Curated annotation (Swiss-Prot):
Keyword Protease: no
Keywords recorded for this protein, A-Z: ATP-binding, Cytoplasm, DNA damage, DNA repair, DNA replication, DNA-binding, Nucleotide-binding, SOS response
Record-given protein name: DNA replication and repair protein RecF
Source species: Anaeromyxobacter sp. (strain K)
Origin: domain of life: Bacteria
Length: 372
């Protein structure tokens, strides 16, 4: 699916933007703080209904405005569709071809064909940072793979909050009543994540070997569940094992007022040659591993959907060494995907630019076309 046109109104620092992107590569150039990332976030928000950066929704609205809006025309096998989302302090409202979700349009229909993968400098810290970032990566990748994950994750968060409240204030029978919904929703997420990791692992190995060469250690990817929950089973068995872990930790959880086992406590383990990359990998190896992980996600979606996702790359070239940047740009040039890239330096992108690459300047929230 291709983004034919993008309209942004009062989103972050973008007052009014009308963009006709290239079907292949659209490059946004400008100094830091001018709005390049905000434009990528507008596209990401349109295709996922979630902010790219964790904030309150009200912070997405331009200062002084009552609400922000993003709309796009997407061309796919079924023709052209218009998706739009308005955001204000009270929440967001999404529409598909003018019909609001829930009253004429379904969430599944909205997300059909809208998979997007974002790659930012923060992602390069994925290996060495804490598990929160790796869980966010897993959930975003799982959502792209199975859009129903969005609702499943929300169900789990609601159940988790309810059980935590019961642990802190409720009697035993109240906690027990909230445990079953948590187990059901948690097992569903655990199985989704397990299946995703199984799909990504061989693609990660192949991409890392291609990036780093034949002498590099073999890359591995594994899912580590908290509380000793073994997720290598059918969903019903995973649910039983999660329930057992929660029962075994009940007194400890009561003391802390917090659920200590479940998807919200798990981690994604990246290793090189059998050793944890977080502790034993060099910075260069860690960055190559993250690059390989992103390529694995793209290739996995390409295989599942029959087409590559929409790509959003936020100033990544400036954070990679020349060899890895050449590899990334070469990969993008060969991929039949629509990509949006930001940079402060045109020279980092230009070697891979094709005749259909479109360049734009972003300055103080204003987006203007540049002559090639």
């Amino acid at each position: 699916m291709k983004l034919l046109s993008l309209h942004v109104q009062d989103f972050r620092n973008l007052a009014a933007v009308a963009l006709a992107p290239s079907p292949r590569a659209t490059v946004l150039l400008g100094e830091n703080g001018q709005g390049k990332t905000n434009l990528l976030e507008a596209i990401y928000f349109l295709t996922t209904l979630k902010p790219l950066r964790a904030v309150r929704l009200a912070e997405l609205v331009r200062f002084g405005a009552d609400q922000g809006a993003v709309a796009g025309d997407f061309e796919g096998p079924g023709g052209v569709r218009r998706v739009a989302v308005q955001v204000a302090a009270g929440g967001r409202t999404a529409t598909l071809d003018g019909k609001a979700l829930g009253s004429g349009a379904r969430l599944d229909d909205y997300f059909e064909g809208l998979a997007s993968v974002c790659f930012s400098p923060d992602d390069l810290l994925l290996v060495k940072a804490g598990p929160d970032g790796r869980r966010r990566f897993l959930d975003r990748a799982a959502f792209n793979r199975w859009p129903a994950v969005l609702g499943e994750a929300r169900e789990y968060v609601r159940a988790l909050r309810a059980r935590n409240a019961a642990l802190r204030a409720g009697p035993a029978e109240v906690e027990a009543s909230f445990r079953e919904p948590l187990v059901r929703a948690g097992a569903r997420l655990l199985v989704r994540r397990r299946e995703l990791v199984a799909e990504l692992a061989p693609r990660l190995q192949a991409a890392f070997a291609e990036i780093s060469g034949p002498e590099a250690p073999e890359a591995h990817l594994a899912y580590r569940a908290a509380g000793g929950v073994d997720v290598a089973h059918p969903e019903a068995e995973v649910a039983a094992r999660l329930a057992h872990a929660l029962e075994a930790r009940l007194e400890r959880d009561r003391e802390k007022g917090f659920t200590s086992a479940g998807p919200h406590m798990d981690d994604l383990v990246l290793a090189l040659g059998g050793k944890g990359a977080r502790l034993y990998g060099s910075q260069g190896q860690q960055r190559a591993l993250v690059l390989a992980l992103k390529i694995a996600e793209i290739e996995n979606l390409r295989a599942a959907l029959g087409r590559p996702p929409l790509l959003l790359l936020d100033d990544v070239s400036s954070e990679l060494d020349p060899a890895k940047n050449r590899f990334l740009l070469g990969y993008l040039a060969a991929l039949p995907a629509q990509a949006f890239l930001t940079s402060t330096d045109r020279r980092l992108i230009e070697p891979a630019a094709g005749p259909d690459t479109a360049f734009f300047e972003v300055r103080s929230g204003v987006v203007s076309p540049l002559v090639s």
